[in-house]
Regions:
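Extended, small-residue-rich solenoid/repeat segments and analogous flexible loops
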Residues: 188, 202-299, 303
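N-terminal small/polar loop signature for handling phosphorylated ligands or for N-terminal nucleophile
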Residues: 415-435, 440-442, 455-457, 462
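An N-terminal, well-structured beta->alpha segment
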Residues: 378-431
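Glycine-rich hexapeptide-repeat left-handed beta-helix
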Residues: 294-389, 393-394, 403
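Catalytic-core segments of class I nucleotidyltransferases/pyrophosphorylases
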Residues: 100-102, 109, 115-122, 135-138, ...
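Buried hydrophobic positions in well-ordered alpha/beta secondary-structure cores of metabolic enzymes
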Residues: 9, 34, 60, 76, ...
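Conserved beta-loop-beta/alpha segment of the NTase-like Rossmann-fold superfamily
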Residues: 60-148, 183-185
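N-terminal glycine-rich phosphate-binding loop and ensuing alpha1 helix
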Residues: 1-61
Length: 462
């Protein structure tokens, strides 16, 4: 049987991790996620593979080439514009011929028994068979309700808990027949989940769901990415981690120095520098040519190629993209991400889920509660001459900026806050007061309720 890997995704929710590469090229234990999918297909004797591409296609083709080094044959089909899942597969029909074939996403992580699904599809003589997975948190996925024979009865897209009639989610892995693809229009976008499968259901054509046991994860965002890493280190998914296991829970491509603290599980690639007193793990992934400084802490975090964590810096649940660095005494909290070549300067603190886009900087000593993206942040707000923060209303200065300023100023105690009698000033004052926490019991300022607007002709703008 032939297969189609859908690898055209941009990975918007995975940013900034996916900004430099298409989503299927996201590194996972030193290799792109899509390489793990190719290994899975080969394990089930599927070696003739089409790859559909759209976003940054050349990076995929340059890395994998013909597929010969992996023992497979890859044929690429590039979309000039997005055609939907079924539309992209339609482009491959000239290569697929008149045989049934398997479709799988290039950015999922799984070890499901694809052979079992193929056999079930053939026994049912199905037009299309959906691989299903019993998910403990089904709200983020499309649910598939089947009868006792496995025939699909209906779909429920991203339900509320009141709509959860099953925990069987659509994995995006399908076995399709030419009969099913005949319903895909020759032109324009067309989607499997929104268009093709409802049409098959409406026309009462054989449409089945095959639940499989094992591991499956949609690597949709940075949190899911870290969860996949932790599950792999825990052995919950069958995956070749590509380097030797030197002791229980410790994978390392190099000998490890004395004077460091390792808490398993950890994965450490070659050409890594671990300085004395470094604390690594649990759930730490350190890619090649990385450096972890003296008494730095890296826990539940992923360091991609060529990154640095300086002395006494602390990472807990963070991701460092290639070329980025966390300088001395900086702190990156759960969900923080440094994009390619981004920098957290000395003493900077990135709070939960704060992300720096590629090339951005968190200045020394700052405390960031919001992400910095290219074009949306001209720098951290500083008090300039005369104790004034200057900026353009709605661009440099907005409610989110004042919330952050208020959260910092209110830490030391009560702070007086006034404003001019203009709508913009009142808006910023309310945001600044809101950032300071609950109102004090007595007195004003310090994060209390916003000040009343002054009478007309009151104090001039600050």
């Amino acid at each position: 049987m032939k297969a189609v890997i859908m690898a055209g995704g941009e990975g918007t929710r995975l940013r900034p991790l996916s900004l430099g590469v298409p989503k299927p090229m996201t590194p996972l234990f030193g290799r792109p996620v899509m390489e793990h999918i190719i290994t899975l297909l080969k394990r089930h004797h599927i070696t003739d593979i089409c790859v559909t591409l759209c976003y940054k296609p050349q990076s995929v083709m340059d890395y994998f080439g013909s597929g010969e080094q992996l023992g497979v044959q890859l044929t690429y089909f590039v979309e000039e514009e997005p055609l939907g899942t079924a539309g992209s597969v339609r482009n491959c029909l000239s290569h697929l011929g008149r045989e049934d074939f398997l479709v799988i996403s290039g950015d999922c992580v799984c070890d499901l028994d694809l052979t079992e699904a193929i056999q079930a599809h053939q026994e049912w003589e199905s037009c299309a068979t959906l691989v299903l997975y019993a998910h403990p948190k089904p709200l983020e996925y499309g649910l598939v309700l089947t009868d006792e024979q496995g025939r699909v009865q209906r779909f429920v897209e991203k339900p509320s808990w009141g709509q959860v009639v099953t925990n069987m989610v659509n994995t995006g892995i399908y076995i399709l027949s030419p009969r099913a693809m005949e319903l895909v229009p020759q032109q324009g976008p067309f989607d499997f989940g929104k268009d093709l499968f409802p049409t098959l259901l409406e026309q009462r054509m054989p449409l089945y769901g095959c639940p499989l046991e094992g591991y499956w994860c949609d690597m949709g965002d940075c949190g899911a990415y870290l969860k996949c890493v932790q599950d792999a280190l825990d052995g919950r998914v069958t995956m070749d981690l590509n380097i030797p296991q030197r002791s229980d829970g410790i994978w390392s491509a190099q000998s490890l120095p004395q004077g460091i603290t390792l808490t398993p599980p950890c994965w450490i690639d070659r050409d890594v520098e671990l300085e004395p007193g470094a604390i690594v793990g649990p759930y730490a992934v350190i890619s090649r040519e990385c450096r972890v400084g003296e008494r730095a802490v890296v826990q539940r975090s992923v360091l991609l190629e060529g990154t640095a964590v300086d002395s006494r810096a602390s990472l807990d649940g963070a991701i460092l993209c290639p070329g980025s660095a966390a300088q001395k005494k900086s702190i990156l909290k759960d969900g923080a991400v440094l994009g390619d070549n981004a920098l957290a300067e000395e003493g900077a603190i990135l709070l939960e889920r704060v992300r720096l886009w590629p090339g951005q900087t968190a200045p020394a000593g700052c405390r960031l509660a919001r992400s910095i993206t290219s074009g949306s942040q001209k720098g951290v707000h500083r008090f300039g001459d005369g104790g004034v923060i200057r900026g353009v209303l709605g661009e440099d200065l907005g409610p989110d900026a004042l919330l952050g300023i208020g959260s910092v100023l209110g830490v030391e105690g009560q702070v007086g806050l006034g404003c001019s009698n203009t709508p913009g000033a009142r808006m910023l004052a309310r945001a600044g007061a809101g950032g300071g926490g609950p109102p004090p019991a007595r007195g004003g300022g310090g994060g209390g309720r916003p000040p009343p607007p002054p009478p007309p002709g009151g104090a001039p703008p600050p």
